Amino acid sequence: MKLIIFTGLALFAIVSLIEAEEESGRGCILLYGECTKATGSCCSNLICDCYRKLKKGVQIARQCFCSEKDVIYKKDI
């Protein structure tokens, strides 16, 4: 019985370590990648630009994308 409990705890510890390593080893978000939920995760040469989505003047959503620093995007009509 003690062996089963010890084995279970050991497996739990191993799985926890693997998950922690995966989270810390995640790469940065590339150009035009969505960064809405992780605004600080763009690669070092990029910034996270956020835009408000409006419908009849009321904000209905917010979307963020990684874009180049010092680049301005304008709407083309």
From Swiss-Prot:
It is found in: Secreted. GO terms for molecular function: toxin activity. One of its GO terms (cellular component) is extracellular region. Residues 21-26 form a propeptide. Its main location: secreted. Contains 4 disulfide bonds. Residues 1-20 form the signal peptide. This is U11-lycotoxin-Ls1b. The lineage of its organism: Eukaryota, Metazoa, Ecdysozoa, Arthropoda, Chelicerata.
